[in-house]
Swiss-Prot record:
<keyword id="KW-0378">Hydrolase</keyword>
<feature type="active site">
    <location>
        <position position="6"/>
    </location>
</feature>
<dbReference type="InterPro" id="IPR029055">
    <property type="entry name" value="Ntn_hydrolases_N"/>
</dbReference>
<keyword id="KW-0021">Allosteric enzyme</keyword>
<protein>
    <recommendedName>
        <fullName>ATP-dependent protease subunit HslV</fullName>
        <ecNumber>3.4.25.2</ecNumber>
    </recommendedName>
</protein>
<feature type="binding site">
    <location>
        <position position="167"/>
    </location>
    <ligand>
        <name>Na(+)</name>
    </ligand>
</feature>
<dbReference type="GO" id="GO:0004298">
    <property type="term" value="F:threonine-type endopeptidase activity"/>
</dbReference>
<feature type="binding site">
    <location>
        <position position="161"/>
    </location>
    <ligand>
        <name>Na(+)</name>
    </ligand>
</feature>
<keyword id="KW-0963">Cytoplasm</keyword>
<keyword id="KW-0888">Threonine protease</keyword>
<dbReference type="GO" id="GO:0051603">
    <property type="term" value="P:proteolysis involved in protein catabolic process"/>
</dbReference>
<keyword id="KW-0645">Protease</keyword>
<dbReference type="InterPro" id="IPR001353">
    <property type="entry name" value="Proteasome_sua/b"/>
</dbReference>
<comment type="similarity">
    <text>Belongs to the peptidase T1B family. HslV subfamily.</text>
</comment>
<dbReference type="GO" id="GO:0046872">
    <property type="term" value="F:metal ion binding"/>
</dbReference>
<dbReference type="GO" id="GO:0005839">
    <property type="term" value="C:proteasome core complex"/>
</dbReference>
<keyword id="KW-0479">Metal-binding</keyword>
Length: 176
């Protein structure tokens, strides 16, 4: 799956988990919106979630994921695995084109429609067309500075916005 039009980044440092997403929505080669909100808090404010891909599909997945969080008592790991299983096996969900990046204070997961739940090795992860740029910048800042998680997300997202034509610098940031 190839997703244009977004960058979502999460960084964890010193007990802070911070997620940022750009605001650009692109249709083909046209920017339709510059201030979309692709990052939100779920699970009574204890879980961060961001999406790359179709907005309508992502809203469906946010709803399903939040239901899984409730079903599993806020257990992010179990909710992520159960959503991925449903996403892979459900006839309707299988057609949804999006990726989810979810995190709490302890865990970070990328959830795909292929039934994959990926937990990164580091305290950072990113999805979307600008994800590789944001992730590279975040890793460099994590390794070489004492910046807070929020400052790293802000700086890395700005760098991604300078490089990726499908990412703007109108950043929405949430933290737990």
């Amino acid at each position: 799956m190839k997703f244009h039009g977004t960058t979502i980044l999460v960084v964890r440092r010193n007990g802070q988990t911070v997620m940022g997403g750009d605001g650009q929505v692109t249709f083909g080669s046209t920017v339709l919106k510059g201030n979309a909100r692709k990052v939100r808090k779920l699970g009574e404010g204890k879980v961060l979630a961001g999406f790359a891909g179709s907005v309508a599909d992502a809203m469906t997945l946010f709803d399903r994921f939040e239901a899984k969080l409730r079903e599993w008592g806020g257990n992010l790991t179990k909710a992520a695995v159960e959503l991925a299983k449903d996403w892979r096996t459900d006839r309707v969900l299988r057609r949804l084109e999006a990726l989810l990046l979810v995190a709490d204070k302890e865990n970070i997961f990328i959830i795909s429609g292929n039934g994959e739940v990926i937990q990164p090795d580091d305290d950072a992860a990113a999805i979307g067309s600008g994800g590789p740029y944001a992730l590279a910048a975040a890793k460099a800042l994590l390794r070489n500075t004492d910046l807070s998680a929020r400052e790293i997300v802000e700086k890395a997202m700005m760098i991604a916005g300078e490089i990726c034509i499908y990412t703007n610098q109108n950043i929405v940031i949430e933290e737990v």
